[in-house]
Amino acid sequence: MIDILEHINAVQREVSRTGETVSLQMRRAYRATPEELWDALTDPTRLARWFWPTTGNFQVGGSFQLQDMAGGDILECEPPKGFKVTYGGPNSFLEIRLHPAANDSTDLELEHVVTGIPMPGAGGALYVGPGWDGGLLGLALYVAGLPDDHNPVTFADSPEMLKFNEQSVRAWLKVVRDSGTTSEEDLLEAAKVSMAQFAPGVEL
């Protein structure tokens, strides 16, 4: 069993908006070196253990594809400091930055910038934020040592993960509300869509 609130609270979340562009930022510390995290984030074999089955050529000019999900192009790649890719479309950019910290730990920063999300204000962060929360959780579980039979695809639909997703949606709801970029009506509509996707059957 995972401590859901511990993992939710381990992440710092921010959201901002400039015109039609929404930026989502996340930060979390990991008890692993930047080199260890880099391998976990870019080696398809390791990605399949904690995130999702992935194929591709992880170098500048290469591309990647998540099984039955998003893909993109590698725009920047500087191991073990970070990378920048398109994610799911030409107007969606994902950047990961790894910063060495004390005692062989690493501070990970994730930024996802999207232009033209079909939701007013920064409410679109509720469409992608919970998914990245799940990814950062998976990485934390991987660093701590996953059991041999762990499958991230089936784990994504487990009751435990759905409870985690519910708390993630609520966390992002607060972050977007505090940003002041979205009306309450539009925000609640985005939250309902997000909850239906990430935690079906749960009411706000």
Say what each PLM segment does.
Residues 1-19, 113-204:
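Terminal "cap-and-tail" regions of soluble proteins that handle hydrophobic small molecules
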Residues 18-21, 25-26, 32-36, 44-82:
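Short beta-edge strand/loop motif at the mouth of beta-sheet-based domains
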Residues 76, 98-102:
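Short, low-complexity Ser/Thr-rich regulatory SLiMs
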Residues 90-91:
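Amphipathic hydrophobic-ligand
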